[in-house]
Amino acid sequence: MNLIVTDIERITVRAPMTPRCEEWNAREVWQWCICEIIRLTTDAGIVGYGETLPHYTWGRVSDEAIARVKGQNAADFLGDDTLCAGLHMAIYDVVGKALNVPAYRLFIMPK
């Protein structure tokens, strides 16, 4: 399977919260409302999405991670825990779509 990554877009959003959650977040973890959405496109036209809370997980997707993945086969990065969570999820999403299986099934597939 050849899924060459042609584009990776980072979209940062501030998710609205209920007043109760806003109050709690203001005291504890105010940055939990900030999300980074990753949109990964392949040469086959398949688009995969991933998301992360950059202040809670591994952080924002770095320029270095994008440069490492862009132009490469997305399937080669399955199981690569050095990528940030959002990019890793987008890779699983795009490979799952290419194989016509839910992304979670990729965790139990033989290599």
Language-model features: locations:
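Structured beta-strand/loop patches that form or line metal/cofactor-binding pockets in enzymes
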Residues: 1-49, 53
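Metal- or metallocofactor-binding catalytic centers and their adjacent structured scaffolds
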Residues: 7-8, 40-110
